[in-house]
Amino acid sequence: SVWAPWYTLHKLFSGLIDQYLYTDNKQALEVVTRMGDWAYNKLKPLDEPTRKRMIRNEFGGVNESFYNLYAITGDERYQWLAEFFYHNDVIDPLKEQRDDLGTKHTNTFIPKVLAEARNYELTQDNDSRKLTDFFWHTMIDHHTFAPGCSSDKEHYFDPQQLSKHLTGYTGETCCTYNMLKLSRHLFCWTGDAKVADYYERALYNHILASQEPDKGGFVYFAPMRPGHY
């Protein structure tokens, strides 16, 4: 009856890690490491069929948080947790350089690739780097609208049918936010101007444009439908 517990927990892990990294809040680090210990003790006994069944549900980028916690502490239990959330059905096709995105939920994919980017930075796993690069270019070249946003009703669609998806439900802000995060990783590795160009385009046309500066309003979608807001 619970929608996505690890998706919610990811926000707690990520926020506490940021508290420690950006404000040197030692209490935040203590809390998040205890949460990591709890997660390890809870998940370590699970068998493989149970693991695969569990990660079919959306879990956000909790594996990225575990990689970050591993980077901070050096505790290999947190690396194990990050690898535990490796989603074979999603990541394996990208390793094979296949665009298997279909009509799947867009923002379920991007955080999982973010975790692979972090894995490469910590372990020099070249498979993780290659699939990150492939995914980024596939997204930008085939699944992104002109302003830098992606998705219709939160899902991928056939890029050959783009004209049928100029709706009032395009451009989920979460997707662009995570694509900017992924772009930062890629640009640090390559210095590729194409990555920086996308970052600038998506930041100004979508992320900043989604906010109303005077009254504090914001929008969830960036509609591509003419005259729709």
Which positions does each model-derived feature cover?
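Glycan-recognition and catalytic cores of secretory/periplasmic carbohydrate-active enzymes
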Residues: 1-229
